[in-house]
């Protein structure tokens, strides 16, 4: 399947200033992310940014980059603008890779892209939770699926709630209980991506602070690729940055 990867990147970060430009083994983080995406088999990889410094860093490292407006409320709106500028067809598949994932598995990008079909215009990924602390951590977003592997709901709460298992103990995951952790990787059919910014914000999205709930609330199916392996963690804190720097200097 042919697909395009678009990587939204903003310079502002409350916990880690100038994160996209952080040096990782001699290259900016955003360049490292793009290089991983290039290994996915994507027909095109392009960075979407509203900052001249990120644009310059990409250009200096031969990474395709497109300037965008500065007023986008989300990364999804930003990649929708770039897809429109590129003149991609309605049926084109676009994958949104986060700009702070320099260790993302290229095969995960490709597997998520392949789930897009005429019936399912959006896809994402998940993996099995094996740590009870993650099951109860509201910063770990959970997802439950239907029999077709499509998302029924995303939540910061522990879903599904194993009534009998948790009645016995909340110190360990119940037997035969496999909660899924959502991975923030998204693929779209371009026709839906262009319509997305016009979708009204949903009450559930506001309650949970999860943008993907807007899609489900409007009745649009989301396919979910379940990977057997937990993905490498992204870079959100100075500690994360040190960990990833060690990887690139080995």
UniProtKB/Swiss-Prot annotation:
**What is catalysed by this protein?**
3-deoxy-alpha-D-manno-oct-2-ulosonate + CTP = CMP-3-deoxy-beta-D-manno-octulosonate + diphosphate
- Known EC number(s)? 2.7.7.38
Q: Which GO terms describe its biological process?
A: CMP-keto-3-deoxy-D-manno-octulosonic acid biosynthetic process; lipopolysaccharide biosynthetic process
Q: Any idea which UniProt keywords this protein has?
A: Cytoplasm, Lipopolysaccharide biosynthesis, Nucleotidyltransferase, Transferase
One Pfam family this sequence matches: CTP_transf_3
- According to its UniProt record, where is this protein mainly located? cytoplasm
Q: Where is the signal peptide?
A: none
Any one Gene Ontology MF annotation carried by this entry is:
3-deoxy-manno-octulosonate cytidylyltransferase activity
Sorted alphabetically, the Gene Ontology cellular component annotations on this record are: cytosol
Q: Which domain of life is it from?
A: Bacteria
Keyword Cytoplasm listed? The answer is yes
Tell me where in or outside the cell this protein is found.
Cytoplasm
Q: Does the keyword Nucleotidyltransferase apply?
A: yes
Name its pathway: Nucleotide-sugar biosynthesis; CMP-3-deoxy-D-manno-octulosonate biosynthesis; CMP-3-deoxy-D-manno-octulosonate from 3-deoxy-D-manno-octulosonate and CTP: step 1/1; Bacterial outer membrane biogenesis; lipopolysaccharide biosynthesis
InterPro entries recorded for this chain?
Cytidylyl_trans, KdsB, Nucleotide-diphossugar_trans
| Role summary | Activates KDO (a required 8-carbon sugar) for incorporation into bacterial lipopolysaccharide in Gram-negative bacteria.
Give the family, as the similarity comment puts it: Belongs to the KdsB family.
Recorded protein name is 3-deoxy-manno-octulosonate cytidylyltransferase
Please tell me the species this chain comes from.
Herminiimonas arsenicoxydans
The record lists the lineage as: Bacteria, Pseudomonadati, Pseudomonadota, Betaproteobacteria, Burkholderiales
